[in-house]
A protein has these predicted regions:
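Hydrophobic h-region of N-terminal signal peptides that target proteins for export
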Residues: 13-22
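Mid-length scaffold segments of soluble, non-membrane domains
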Residues: 75-123
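Acidic, glycine-rich flexible loop segments
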Residues: 110-142
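A generic structural signal for short, solvent-exposed coil/turn residues
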Residues: 14, 52, 82-84, 102, ...
Length: 168
């Protein structure tokens, strides 16, 4: 009887340890299924909702489970002035360093401007952050939006333009 009880307790303990290990999150770039769950279908910005392009969505999750996501939006319903600034959404649950500038957790719009700046705006279209982006002329296959790991951070690409993003 004692052996049976010990086996049951041992099995239960191993099961609990296995469940705890399975629930641990490791830092990673989000896959398509994770993005489907996290990315909104529409995004409110400057008094309007814009459809979000899920096919052009990227993100990462940190070891503590917090996420940051970016996606392009269809900004055709906005004024020309806003379309020139606002290309996508940026939602972060953690503080970020973007091109050397700090960004608090929150929901934002972003855009790679023609003047060489990556701009982040609050949802009222007020500028929050501006940093110089880089251009990768050697990039063979540019895509609308891509995220790659880069040391302790990431590079967010829009075509051949990119900006460094690091969780703080």
């Amino acid at each position: 009887m004692n052996r049976t009880r010990l086996k049951m307790i041992g099995t239960l303990a191993l099961t609990l340890v296995g469940c705890a290990i399975a629930q641990q999150v490791s830092k990673h770039i989000l896959g398509s299924e994770e993005l489907k769950k996290a990315v909104p279908t529409e995004y409110f910005y400057r008094g309007q909702k814009a459809p979000v392009q899920l096919r052009n969505a990227v993100g990462f999750q940190l070891a503590d489970g917090k996420m940051a996501i970016a996606a392009l939006v269809d900004a055709s319903g906005y004024s020309t002035a806003i379309q020139q600034k606002y290309q996508g959404l940026l939602i972060t649950e953690t503080k970020l360093n973007i091109g050397g500038s700090s960004l608090s957790p929150g929901q934002y719009g972003f855009g790679f401007a023609g003047d060489g700046k990556f701009n982040v705006m609050d949802v009222a279209n007020n500028d929050v952050l501006s940093a110089s982006y880089q251009t990768d002329q050697a990039l063979q296959h540019a895509v609308p939006l891509k995220l790659i790991e880069d040391g302790n951070g990431y590079k967010l690409y829009a075509g051949k333009k990119w900006i460094a993003i690091k969780p703080e």
